[in-house]
Amino acid sequence: MNMAIIANGKIEKHARLRSIWANADARIAADGGAVNARQHLELAPHVLIGDLDSLDEATRRWCEQAQTEFLQHPRAKDQTDLELAIDLAIARGAKNISILGTLGGRFDQMLANVLLLIKPARANIPARIAGSDFDAWIATHSATITGNIGDTVSLIPLSERVEGIVTVNLKYPLHNETLYLGSARGVSNALTTIHAEVSFGRGLLMIVHLLESTEHS
């Protein structure tokens, strides 16, 4: 099942984001993410989860009219609203997860949001943070990157080391090499064809793909 999650971060009205949200088999809003859905994506979530402290009355009524399922948690909790949403997606059988609205606002929350991608990656569930002009995801062994020639691709280790990296169709190739946590060596590579491949033997590797300019609508 293809699931989309919307968080309470910065988001904009954009055809790409609306398409991801509309085409998901299940749509989950993490608390104030429902406000983002109402204001920018114009389609209600199937499920709203969190402590709901960021939910305004207009959005609450909008979700109720759409028969959204409400899963309210206490404000004093060990997980963020986005983590609750990711856990719910995994528990309900997600095969693919797209997460919107994770950036902007407090730096600590933004960083934590990005690192939450580790959880579905370890469960072998493909998950990405999707923006209007980028995708970011974590690979555990291999990845295919599809885009336009010249698109920027960055490879960022999230484990102490990522070993045995081999790339195909990137401008600066890696041949059975190691990237280390804290090194920026893998930043700002580029596609040389519309498809590139990355494989490695061990570690967690974040891949960030900056998309060619896309139109608002």
Where are these regions (language model features)?
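N-terminal beta-strand-loop-alpha-helix module at the start
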Residues: 1-62
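General beta-strand structural signal in soluble alpha/beta enzymes
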Residues: 6, 28-31, 50, 71-72, ...
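Short, well-ordered alpha-helix to beta-strand connector turns
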Residues: 24-25, 45, 66-67, 94, ...
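Short phosphate-binding loop-to-helix
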Residues: 70-91
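Short Gly/Thr/Asp-enriched flexible loops that form oxyanion-binding sites at enzyme active sites
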Residues: 107-118
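Short, acidic/small-residue loops that bind anionic groups at enzyme active sites
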Residues: 119-135
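Long, charged alpha-helical interface segments
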Residues: 132, 139-217
